[in-house]
């Protein structure tokens, strides 16, 4: 089930489900969006800058990409057929399935993908193909949208919130979620009061250690 932000239903859950629900981003957390986007861009003649891993902003990654065009290019990619075939990020497949199959956790994905219905269907198809029934639902926001509003229904719930964008992880922490930041070159120097992890093995150990 995918839900666009303009028709988003606040999903109700009882206390037993709450304890086994994990909120997570998709790109840069479950899926390797950056690698797939890089391949797609290079096929279209864009070349990577020497320090492309150090910035979150894509116009710093490609020599030919101007800041004013970056969001449009991302939206074009996110609404292309390629978005249905992103690979899993690092060891996410193994540990997401362990958390689900061995410990009963389910994952609600909150992703700033697109409001395009076809793109949303491809995103859910991609996630379910890799992670199966571990995916409880997929909430799709506009391309690059902030997640403040989408996270607000979970205020003070104490749910885990797994992200790679520091601003979104910070918001989760501020409203009472257990934020976990997945480390990348663009965020590795972010100072925060919540855990920063390199892979899903570390996420698994954090969650099971507190279970």
List each model region and its residues.
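A general structural motif
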Residues: 17-19, 104-106, 156-158, 176
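Substrate-recognition "cap/lid" segment bordering the active-site pocket of phosphatases
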Residues: 110-160, 166-170
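Short, basic/glycine-rich phosphate-binding loops at helix/coil junctions
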Residues: 64-79, 104-108, 131
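Short, positively charged and aromatic/hydrophobic N-terminal segments
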Residues: 2, 7-13
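Active-site neighborhood of HAD-like aspartate-dependent phosphohydrolases
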Residues: 17-69
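Substrate-recognition element of Asp-dependent hydrolases with the DxDx(T/V) motif
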Residues: 83-88, 92-127
